[in-house]
UniProtKB/Swiss-Prot annotation:
Lineage summary: Eukaryota, Viridiplantae, Chlorophyta, core chlorophytes, Trebouxiophyceae
Domain of life: Eukaryota
Gene: petG
Name under which the protein is recorded: Cytochrome b6-f complex subunit 5
InterPro entries linked to this entry: Cyt_6/f_cplx_su5, Cyt_6/f_cplx_su5_sf
This protein's record includes keyword Lyase: no
A GO biological process held by the record: photosynthesis
Transmembrane segments: 5-25
Pfam families according to UniProt: PetG
Cellular compartment(s): Plastid, Chloroplast thylakoid membrane
Organism: Chlorella vulgaris (Green alga)
Subunit structure: The 4 large subunits of the cytochrome b6-f complex are cytochrome b6, subunit IV (17 kDa polypeptide, PetD), cytochrome f and the Rieske protein, while the 4 small subunits are PetG, PetL, PetM and PetN. The complex functions as a dimer.
């Protein structure tokens, strides 16, 4: 049970963390473009 729960949590968190990293990188890229202009 514990292993299944942990695997479920990991499978749920991994896509969220990857999406968060992409969003933060995209926002920083947008800010950099605005600052350069």
């Amino acid at each position: 049970m514990v292993e299944a729960l942990l695997s479920g949590i990991v499978l749920g968190l991994v896509p969220v963390t990857i999406a968060g990293l992409f969003v933060t990188a995209y926002l920083q890229y947008r800010r950099g473009d605005q600052l350069n202009i």
